[in-house]
Structure formats: C-alpha cells, structure tokens
C-alpha cells in the first residue's frame, strides 16, 4: 500500500510550466521571476519539481503561464522531439564554480527548457486572457497539460 502511494507521488512531483503570454507591460518582479524560471519567451516550457519554492514562483506568475503534472510519456516525447543538447560551460575557468543549467537524461546533457510551437487548434475558447476554468489558457490545468504539450510539440 505504501509503495503504491509513493510511486503515485513520484509521478506527480514533476510539473510542466508553459509561458502563454508575452513580454509587454510586465512588472519588474514578474520579469525577474520569469528570469529565475528561465522562461524568456512565449511558448517556452520548463519541467520542474513540485517544491514549495518553485510552486511559489509559479503562483506569482500565474496570470502569464499555465502548468500541470506532466506524464512520463509526454516528457519522453518532448525530450525526443524538442530537447536541445546543452553546449555551454560545465565549469568556470578556474574550476571554482560548476554550472547546473542542464539536466542529465540517459547520459546526455539537455537544456532545462523546451522551445515549443504554438498549439494546434489554439489554447481554448476564450484565448490567453482567461483562466483554464473559465475556458481560457491560464493557470493550473492538472493532467490536461499533457494534451496541450502534445499539440505544441
């Protein structure tokens, strides 16, 4: 019983965050949060763990992003189709600091973000100015993030 519960928790610990709205007329603190999340442009996606710190950052930019729990199949498909190999520095010139701007999957180093195309058939009935509950695209969408990501790959 406990092992089943733990495996379900492990799968739901990974969130996919997709930036839906653009760069114009953003407050300074919102811009900084997007920089910390590495979501610089519209239709970029990051995959993060569901920690309280990252959850707070996502809730701060909730009016500009959509997020939900990503399945293993969708994550594998995103890595296969849109994963970019990391080509930056691993250490600085004096070996004092190591960079962790990459994720190691199957022995390969990938960037932490995915550049996606706009979704086929759009975001929703009401577009990008309303929440997902109201028929738009913003906010938490749970497992339905997988459908959106498959349309964006």
Give a label for each model feature.
Residues 1-153:
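Core subunits and conserved enzymes of cellular information-processing
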């Amino acid at each position: 019983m406990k092992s089943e519960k733990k495996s379900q928790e492990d799968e739901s610990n990974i969130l996919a965050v997709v930036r839906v709205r653009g760069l114009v007329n953003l407050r300074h603190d919102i811009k900084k949060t997007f920089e910390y999340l590495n979501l610089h442009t519209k239709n970029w996606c990051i995959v993060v763990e569901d920690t309280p710190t990252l959850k707070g950052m996502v809730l701060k930019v909730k009016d500009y992003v959509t997020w939900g729990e990503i399945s293993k199949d969708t994550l594998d498909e995103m890595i296969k189709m849109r994963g970019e190999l990391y080509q930056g520095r691993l250490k600085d010139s004096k070996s004092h600091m190591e960079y962790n701007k990459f994720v190691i999957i199957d022995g390969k180093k990938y960037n932490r973000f995915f550049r996606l195309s706009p979704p086929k058939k759009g975001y929703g009935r009401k577009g990008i100015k309303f929440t997902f509950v109201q028929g738009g695209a913003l906010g938490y969408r749970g497992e339905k993030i997988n459908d959106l990501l498959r349309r964006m790959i």
